[in-house]
Amino acid sequence: MAKKSAIYGEYVVSVKDDGAIEVFRNYDNVKGSLREIAESKGFAYDPSWNTQQFGARLIKEFGEGSEAHVDNYVIVKKDNGHIDTYRTYENTKEALRSISSATGFEFDSNWTTRQMGSKLIDFLNNLNNK
């Protein structure tokens, strides 16, 4: 569960219950993200596969059941067959800097990841409410 969160484009920034900051990217272009995942692992694929076929094959190769974790990527097959992909970030502060740069959010380089994440969430929520 998250104490607070904000969405910017494909990115979600959250303050978790323990105060840690989490950033993930929920891909709009799922097939493109599946290609990115496959290529990062040297997984051969057929360009004619649809998103459901592609996702199911990657899950079979790298996961189990309806989910696969491939490095920082997660592939999920929903009950209706729909495939979702998202990416987490090892370097949370770098992801926060990237989002800050894209949104015009000015930050203090001395802020901790928790400070920066919390303030960025407030900024994004204010931006979204305008």
Region spans (language model):
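Short Lys/Arg-rich cationic patches that frequently serve as NLS/NoLS or arginine-rich RNA/DNA-binding motifs
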Residues: A2-A6
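Short, surface-exposed coil-to-beta transition loops
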Residues: I7-Y8, V70
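Acidic, low-complexity, intrinsically disordered interaction modules
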Residues: K16-A20, F24-R57, E61-S109, R114
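Short acidic DE-rich linear segments
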Residues: L127-K130
